[in-house]
Structure formats: structure tokens, C-alpha cells
Amino acid sequence: MPKVEVKNGDLDAALKSFKRITSETEKAYKKHEFYLRPGLRKKEKEKAAAKKRNKYNKRRSFYY
């Protein structure tokens, strides 16, 4: 169970760090939820890279 210490009554910062920690745990769980063959894992990785690249190019072209 993730633990976060609240310092100086700053609940917002503690809540933010708690959400970040739990989201990382959730991502790791979903990643290892079932077995992916190496070829499919590679395709997913390439698909994610293309999505990231398209997002970057879209933001970059907005300013021109």
C-alpha cells in the first residue's frame, strides 16, 4: 500500500504525489496483466512511438 506523508498540512501536494504513485502502480499492473508475444510487444511500442511523434509534430506545426 502506497504511503504519503503530509507535511505542514499541505494536503494538496500530498494528494498529488499519492495519485502519481498509484497511477504508476496501476500502469505496471496493466502492463503485466497478460503475456504479450515479443512481436506484438514490438508493434505496440512502435504504435506508441508513432502516436507520441504525431502529437509532437501537431504541437510543433501549430506555431508555424
UniProtKB/Swiss-Prot annotation:
Residues 42-64 are annotated as: Disordered. Pfam families: Ribosomal_S21 (PF01165). GO terms for cellular component: ribonucleoprotein complex; ribosome. Coiled coil: none annotated. It comes from the Bacteria. One of its GO terms (biological process) is translation. Keywords: Ribonucleoprotein, Ribosomal protein. One of its GO terms (molecular function) is structural constituent of ribosome. Residues 50-64 have a biased composition (Basic residues). NCBIfam families: S21p (TIGR00030). Belongs to the bacterial ribosomal protein bS21 family. This is Small ribosomal subunit protein bS21. The lineage of its organism: Bacteria, Bacillati, Mycoplasmatota, Mycoplasmoidales, Mycoplasmoidaceae. The gene is rpsU.
